[in-house]
């Protein structure tokens, strides 16, 4: 008679077995496609206590166990001012799932609570800075964040609708303020629905968002709140009812931009106008596929 698996073993096995197609394979695809991990890397996996960062930690552990490519992992938790019960939940989940976390404190919530305009943006920027600094202190050259496929889509649509910009979320980027540091997003191709399914399958409870602005959403567990991002999330859910592939289409779109069809674009902060490009001898070579499609419509 085989012994009963521990919660940690069940969670790990389900990533490789039950959710291999929807979680493990897309995770590996992103790591390979975007060259996120290199031999000799020392990566700080940043854990907020939510489902996304925790599943990222488990996936990175599994990858480290099953790859011949040597790299090191550090599991880092920044406490920006959590309530004691929220911090305890993070610690309990780390113990339950076998994640050896390092916790450090900051006063980010105290700073941002008094900010009326864009507190979430300020909080995110401050968090990023603290995480880079601590990771560098721990000898890491990369930080890994839990942004997933759905975040990429929502960010793109939100920027277009509310920011007046067609801008995506890159799978990795170099830090401007911390030389030698990079940020990677290994969940780039993993859908949020799959992460929620894994969480429910393993009967796990995570922080929804422990921010003081959004604590009322903790018990819901559906990822829906009151921010502009949540408005976009709900809009996409509605659109998926009539077009199930809408997120896939958006993702393919940002992976295959045809710049010669745009009236202008920015590259490394420099704006390039349509006349500038139109008159460039190597840029325009005639009608584009999008023009043909437009004429058909």
Regions found by a protein language model. Give the residues of each.
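ATP-dependent adenylation/nucleotidyltransferase module used to activate substrates
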Residues: 2-158, 162-166, 170, 174, ...
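Electropositive phosphate-/nucleotide-binding environments in soluble metabolic enzymes
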Residues: 17, 21, 84, 125, ...
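Long, contiguous hydrophobic alpha-helical segments, chiefly transmembrane helices and signal peptides
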Residues: 27, 187, 251-254
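Catalytic subdomain that performs nucleotidyl-dependent activation
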Residues: 73, 150-235
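Short, basic, helix/turn surface patches
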Residues: 126-138, 172-178, 233-253
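The feature marks non-catalytic terminal segments
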Residues: 204-297
């Amino acid at each position: 008679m085989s012994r009963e698996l521990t919660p940690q073993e069940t969670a790990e096995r389900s990533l490789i077995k039950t959710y291999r197609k929807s979680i493990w394979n897309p995770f590996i695809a992103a790591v390979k496609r975007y060259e996120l991990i290199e031999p000799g890397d020392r990566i700080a996996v940043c854990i907020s206590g939510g489902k996304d960062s925790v599943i990222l930690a488990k996936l990175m552990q599994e990858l480290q166990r099953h790859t011949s490519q040597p790299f090191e992992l550090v599991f880092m938790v920044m406490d920006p001012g959590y309530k004691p019960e929220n911090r305890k939940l993070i610690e309990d989940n780390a113990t339950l799932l076998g994640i050896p976390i390092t916790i450090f404190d900051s006063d980010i919530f105290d700073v941002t609570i008094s900010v009326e305009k864009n507190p979430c943006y300020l909080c995110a920027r401050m968090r990023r800075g603290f995480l880079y600094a601590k990771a560098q202190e721990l000898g890491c050259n990369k930080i890994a964040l839990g942004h997933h496929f759905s975040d990429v889509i929502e960010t793109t649509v939100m920027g277009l609708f509310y920011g007046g910009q067609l801008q995506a979320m890159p799978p990795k980027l170099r830090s401007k303020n911390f030389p030698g540091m990079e940020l990677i997003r290994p969940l780039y191709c993993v859908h949020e629905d799959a992460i929620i399914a894994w969480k429910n399958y393993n009967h796990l409870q995570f922080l929804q968002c422990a921010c003081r602005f959004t604590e009322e959403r903790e018990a819901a567990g559906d990822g829906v709140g009151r921010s502009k991002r949540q408005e976009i999330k709900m809009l996409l859910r509605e659109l998926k009812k009539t077009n199930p592939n809408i997120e896939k289409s958006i993702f393919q779109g940002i992976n295959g931009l045809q710049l010669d069809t745009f009236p202008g674009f920015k590259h490394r902060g420099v704006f390039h106008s349509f006349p500038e490009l139109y008159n460039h001898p190597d840029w325009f070579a005639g009608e584009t596929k999008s023009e043909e499609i437009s004429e058909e419509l």
